């Protein structure tokens, strides 16, 4: 450990959705030359093998678990920049999506520390790839919303409603405890979704531990997925007609890509 006359540089690196080989080439190169790596709890051990020479510091950040306070992480990054040349803050998914990167950037910039953000693949995109279903579909889904319930759950009382945005495809991060409530509200709102709307839930997406649960919004509202969840794994909840493989009506299978026929029967 050495002290530098000028601060080191901090890289906020997106670790991607889970699998170690889904980190970007730039991210892997930075890990290989990092002096110290501050990593999220959800980062796979195999990814940390990419930085064998670096000091590795776990900083938590796991929904529902004891973790480092954000202001404490900010301070540790600033302090590390005084002692090391290359500092990596390894964040699950993409740093700029539900990663509180803005707080770290502001803290480092205020301290005169140079910061660079290296994007990563967010879990929603890996989830769509895993089930082989696009989040958008011509004639069916033109909008996608990513929603996190982590902070909202802390501030919201049990009886208060969840704010569901209006979009054709909805992807919820960290919403395991609220799945039935989400489904009930979407059905009751009668906007873009109904009881027969497809639902796909993925845990530990892109890793060897990945599990999938597929059904409908109605089944989700009945709590059918509650006993399926593994509380130790991150869950992704995907909802929308674009996720339907086939539409079955009167024993007739209609390919979801046949927009004209779909609109004729269901539009």
Feature-to-residue mapping (PLM):
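Class I S-adenosyl-L-methionine
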Residues: 1-20, 25-118, 224, 232-235
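A contiguous loop/helix-start segment that scaffolds small-molecule binding in enzyme catalytic cores
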Residues: 7-10, 82-87, 151-267
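Short hydrophobic/aromatic-enriched beta-strand-loop microsegments
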Residues: 55-61, 112-116, 135-142, 192-201
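Short, acidic/turn-prone active-site loops that include or flank metal/cofactor-
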Residues: 17, 42-44, 60-67, 121-123, ...
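Class I SAM-dependent methyltransferase SAM-binding "motif I" and its flanking Rossmann-like core
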Residues: 2, 94-166, 211-214
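Short, hinge-like loop/turn segments at secondary-structure boundaries
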Residues: 55-58, 75, 106, 132-138, ...
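Residue-level signal for well-ordered alpha-helical positions
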Residues: 50, 130-131, 185
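Short hydrophobic alpha-helical segments that form membrane-spanning helices or hydrophobic packing faces
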Residues: 25, 126-128, 182-183
